[in-house]
Amino acid sequence: MTAVQWRSHLTDDQQRQVRDLVTAATQVDGVAPVGEQVLRELAQQRTEHLLVEDQSPGKSAIGYLNLSPAHGADAAMAELVVHPQARRRGIATAMVRAALAKTGGRNQFWAHGTLAPAQATASALGLTPVRELVQMRRSLRQLPEPVIPNGLQIRTYAGTEDDAELLRVNNAAFAYHPEQGGWTEADLAERRGEPWFDPAGLFLALEGSEGAEDSPRGQPRLLGFHWTKIHLDDPGLGEVYVLGVDPAAQGRGLGRTLTMIGLRSLAQRLGDRDLGRESTVMLYVESDNIAAVRTYQGLGFSTHSVDTAYALAAPDAALA
């Protein structure tokens, strides 16, 4: 293994190698080792990249760690992957130690799928679970008809003229959330640029014309939205990508209505394809959001996997 080296920029070839590394790990483990945001960051200079290369003439990537900076009260976050053929050589441990040294022990680590090797590495280094993100799934068969309350308008995304209201509702609904809160126009633009983006899969719930005088430019006010996603690399899999309801509009059943509208749309769009297997939908929810977990269970979802964030319990003592 070569020396661990931090980079603020990856070449096109290094980005390709990291993507190949992620693909190799996913095929063996059955779960992606890093989130989609990490893949978006490969071409950017907003995060730090730790690349471990083998000693072959081509210097192929056998280990990678992405470190996103801290934002306000939210800790810096690391996500890492080691090539299946290069495991049990101390590469993951070396990368974790390098990240802890860089942040003074104050960053967290995502372990997607909470696999046994990740648990063992965390335990050996004194890392403890601080957050759990539950992935839930259900079949897209036998979906009930959504009940649309009186005075509610449902339409799909019309373009950038909807962005201001989308950001307002998103940032109000997820004010507490490390990844989903605080979005800007740039965040929306990045996702519109993704190959999977389909405006017909972004549903908006707006109040009737009687509330229009209270909204910008006299247009109906956005109460909530459901952004769906079809996974292009996993035929037959859809996702509740973002489901947000304005806190001022909660208690009206909008979340359930929007969920079912989006699921029926996913079922129709995926049903148009010759998949050879049953279509499925997934979503992520914080494990401590008991109300949301129970709501999704009531809609037929069950736990598929759990992602765990680890951190040092006492950074100063551990690194002293």
From Swiss-Prot:
Domain of life: Bacteria
Record has Aminoacyl-tRNA synthetase as a keyword: no
Name of a matching Pfam family: Acetyltransf_1
Binding residues for acetyl-CoA 1: 80-82, 88-93
UniProt entry tagged with the keyword Cytoplasm: no
Reactions it catalyzes: 1D-myo-inositol 2-(L-cysteinylamino)-2-deoxy-alpha-D-glucopyranoside + acetyl-CoA = mycothiol + CoA + H(+)
Binding site for 1D-myo-inositol 2-(L-cysteinylamino)-2-deoxy-alpha-D-glucopyranoside: 36, 179, 229, 239, 284
Domain (N-acetyltransferase) ranges: 16-141, 152-320
List of residues binding acetyl-CoA 2: 243-245, 250-256, 289-294
PROSITE patterns, sorted: GNAT
SUPFAM superfamilies in alphabetical order: Acyl-CoA N-acyltransferases (Nat)
One GO term (biological process): mycothiol biosynthetic process
EC annotation from Swiss-Prot or TrEMBL: 2.3.1.189
Keywords, in A-Z order: Acyltransferase, Repeat, Transferase
Molecular function (Gene Ontology), one example: mycothiol synthase activity
Family, per entry: Belongs to the acetyltransferase family. MshD subfamily.
HAMAP family: MshD
Subunit field text: Monomer.
Its biological purpose: Catalyzes the transfer of acetyl from acetyl-CoA to desacetylmycothiol (Cys-GlcN-Ins) to form mycothiol.
Protein name: Mycothiol acetyltransferase
Organism, as annotated: Mycobacterium marinum (strain ATCC BAA-535 / M)
Originating gene: mshD
